[in-house]
From Swiss-Prot:
Pfam families membership: Caudo_TAP (PF02413)
Protein name from the UniProt record: Prophage tail fiber assembly protein homolog TfaR
Name of the gene this protein is made from: tfaR
Originating organism: Escherichia coli (strain K12)
Superkingdom, taxonomy of origin: Bacteria
Protein family per UniProt: Belongs to the tfa family.
Length: 191
């Protein structure tokens, strides 16, 4: 039944709505003075029974209630990336998510569970080894440059010549490191 204004003051039961979402947040009695309408964000139409995991949302255009899934405050996981998604809005869950969290790094979703993604881990370890190798090559080159300058100018001390030889040997051994065997690499010792 739709609300009708009256010439008489009255107290009626109203159902309060959350501004913005129009979801049911409680009921109470409201005093309605003559020739006035309902308080803002309320209706006099009772909501349906609300099962767990849902909220009742009032559609003021249709003057009716709808049950909408409510997963707010919960965390789900994107099956493509494994990233956690915090649900903050009403409605059904996004597609391609699961309630199951991945256990550790390098996990992929197989349709029913998270499984170890050995290929992704291997590629990560190779990239990590390449980065380490590049950084160590840069360190070696930075040590070699001034020692090589001293040798080229024939002003290097015996200690500098020995260090130059050690750093060059280190750089050659480092260059021979095969990063495709990332987990089995034996890095040469720094001079």
């Amino acid at each position: 039944m739709a609300f009708r204004m009256s010439e008489q003051p009255r107290t009626i039961k109203i159902y309060n709505l959350l501004a913005g979402t129009n979801e049911f947040i409680g009921e109470g009695d409201a005093y309605i003075p003559p020739h006035t309408g309902l308080p803002a964000n309320s209706t006099d139409i009772a909501p349906p029974d609300i099962p767990a995991g849902f909220v009742a949302v009032f559609n003021s255009d249709e003057s009716s209630w709808h049950l909408v899934e409510d997963h707010r405050g919960k965390t789900v996981y994107d099956v493509a990336s494994g990233n956690a998604l915090f649900i903050s809005e009403l409605g059904p869950l996004p597609e391609n998510v699961t309630w199951l969290s991945p256990e550790g790094e390098f996990q992929k979703w197989n349709g029913t569970a998270w499984v170890k993604d050995t290929e992704a881990e291997k590629l990560f370890r190779i990239r990590e080894a390449e980065e380490t190798k590049n950084n160590l090559m840069q360190v070696a080159s930075e040590h070699i440059a001034p020692l090589q300058d001293a040798a080229d100018l024939e002003i290097a001390t015996e200690e500098e010549i020995s260090l130059l030889e050690a750093w060059k040997k280190y750089r050659v051994l480092l260059n021979r490191v095969d990063t495709s065997t990332a987990q089995d690499i034996e890095w040469p010792a720094l001079p």
